[in-house]
A protein has these predicted regions:
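Short, structured active-site-proximal loop/turn typified by the sulfatase FGly-forming signature C/S-X-P-X-R
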Residues: 53-89, 96-97
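Metal-dependent active-site segment of extracytoplasmic phospho-/sulfohydrolases and closely related
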Residues: 43-44, 62, 212-252
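Bacterial Sec-dependent N-terminal signal peptides
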Residues: 14-42
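Structural recognition of the beta-strand scaffold that forms the well-ordered cores
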Residues: 42-46, 53, 73-77, 91-94, ...
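Active-site His/acidic residue clusters
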Residues: 141-153, 169-215
Length: 309
């Protein structure tokens, strides 16, 4: 009996020394699809290192004007994860769970739990017989570690922002090499400018990079508008970011220039929650809600909420 007690104590001691991870009490369940929903599409434009106070009429005229439209949800106070690395924040945006669940705590992605907390596209692929999910990124770890084999198409090598934009145009206009129903884009050069010169609306290199991205975003939005008007396609449009920045870094999680960023959601016929401040886990459930996909597993696992009313 004493030997048994000693063995149990040793086991408890070993377990207590391991890094604590949340216990997943959610079970896999059937994914349900609202069959009244058809022809819904989603474009997510991800801009790495977007400091909120750089969204001005002079620097980003298109996004500045978009933010005040009646059919847009916008906040400059969108909450990042407490861990302000890129890895944890893109992971939370794309899985709908906080970093202590998906266990991405830096940009190495070591110990990630995407098999338990997969990206939202996993549920779309489970619900729809035929859906084309795709991702084009400048920062390739998003495709390598988060998306892995979950999507139908991902860019295979690191691209610069101009190449991301051109590849997105090819997909959206030409349907080449795939005609996307749900498309995620990632622009990284703003973050690079911040690290090299400073994250600030007073830094010319940061400003010029953001102005260039604003032109890309306007062009992408116009393509979506044409698809809505000419082809009858029903697109939900997002602009999101992983973190802001201050000086040449974004490690101070207490700094509002770092732990707050922008979040846009636009649709001509939807209403969004007023006076609600989004966080990184709200993107995924909003998309699944719009696409008519639900399950007990999703409700159990995801920390965020849909901002669609």
């Amino acid at each position: 009996m004493k030997k048994l007690l000693l063995l149990l104590l040793c086991v408890l001691c070993f377990v207590s020394c391991e890094k604590d991870l949340p216990i997943n009490l959610c079970v896999e369940s059937e994914v349900f699809l609202d069959t009244t929903i058809s022809n819904h599409n989603v474009l997510i434009v991800g801009i790495d290192g977007f400091r909120s106070d750089a969204l001005t009429e002079d620097i980003t005229p298109f996004m500045y004007n978009l933010s005040s439209r009646d059919d847009v949800y916008f906040t400059p106070f969108h909450k990042t994860e407490e861990d302000t690395y890129s890895g944890p924040n893109w992971s939370s945006l794309l899985t709908g769970v906080h970093y202590y669940k998906h266990n991405v705590v830096d940009n190495s992605f070591v110990g990630s739990r995407f098999s338990t907390y997969p990206p939202f596209q996993y549920y779309l692929e489970s619900a729809y017989q035929q859906i084309n999910t795709s991702s084009i990124t400048n920062w390739n770890p998003i495709n390598t570690y988060i998306y892995q084999q979950y999507l139908d198409y991902t860019s295979e090598s690191t691209l610069n922002d101009s190449m991301v934009f051109q590849s997105a145009r090819d997909l959206l206009i030409e349907g080449y090499p795939i005609d996307p129903d749900v498309l995620f884009l990632h622009f990284d050069e703003l973050d690079a400018a911040g690290h090299s010169f400073g994250f600030s609306p007073e830094v010319s290199e940061y400003v010029s990079t953001l102005s260039k991205i604003d032109v890309f975003v306007e062009s992408l939005f116009n393509i979506i508008e044409e698809k809505r008007n000419d082809l009858g396609e029903d697109w939900l449009f997002f602009i999101v970011s992983d973190h802001g920045g201050d000086g040449t870094g974004h490690g101070d999680a207490e700094n509002p220039h770092i732990n707050q960023t922008i979040f846009f959601s636009q649709h001509p016929d939807l209403s969004f929650k007023p006076n609600y401040i989004t966080n990184q886990t709200d993107l995924s459930p909003t998309i699944l809600d719009y696409m008519g996909v639900d399950s007990e597993e999703i409700d159990c696992k995801m920390d965020g909420i849909s901002i669609i009313e």
